[in-house]
A protein has these predicted regions:
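Extracellular receptor-binding modules and their adjoining Ser/Thr/Gly/Asp/Asn-rich linkers
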Residues: 1-141
Length: 141
């Protein structure tokens, strides 16, 4: 376990991607892979902002946010995300998060990862000076 001075709660999983801020989706065999398109189900975000993390093993080395806020790479422009604070997001190409339309959320709500929380203007975050790298804050479900 790690100290509780950070943003989200994470669990370690087996994944083919370890880059914080990327969306990875369940494969159905207890592993996760980088998202390749919009509206893939069972999406998760790799975290480098977690306060607590559980489940690390020799195989499970990727911290995935399960609650709280996490920095994620946006598919649409940061300006578009600023206009849509509070809206749901889903997976996008190349491990990004994408803004869901009302119809998509009604028809495929199970594809939602969380909601848009903030679009930071700062370059680093927290006492650990975590690089933001153009990411946005998502409140994960």
């Amino acid at each position: 376990m790690y100290g509780a001075c950070w943003n989200d709660y994470a669990e370690y999983r087996i994944s083919d991607c370890q880059e914080p801020g990327r969306v990875i989706c369940e494969n159905g065999d207890d592993t996760l892979s980088l998202s390749t398109e919009r509206l893939q189900s069972a999406g998760n975000v790799i975290s480098d902002t977690f306060g607590f993390a559980i489940g690390e093993t020799e195989q499970a080395k990727t911290p995935v946010a399960v609650s709280g806020r996490v920095l994620a790479y946006p598919y649409e422009s940061r300006e578009e995300f600023k206009k849509n604070i509070g809206r749901p997001v889903c997976s996008g190409p190349n491990g990004t998060v994408s803004i869901m339309t009302d119809k998509e959320y009604r028809d495929k709500g199970y594809c939602a990862i969380g909601t848009i929380s903030a679009v930071p203007e700062y370059e680093t975050w927290g006492e650990g000076n975590i690089p933001v790298n153009g990411r946005i804050w998502i409140k994960v479900f």
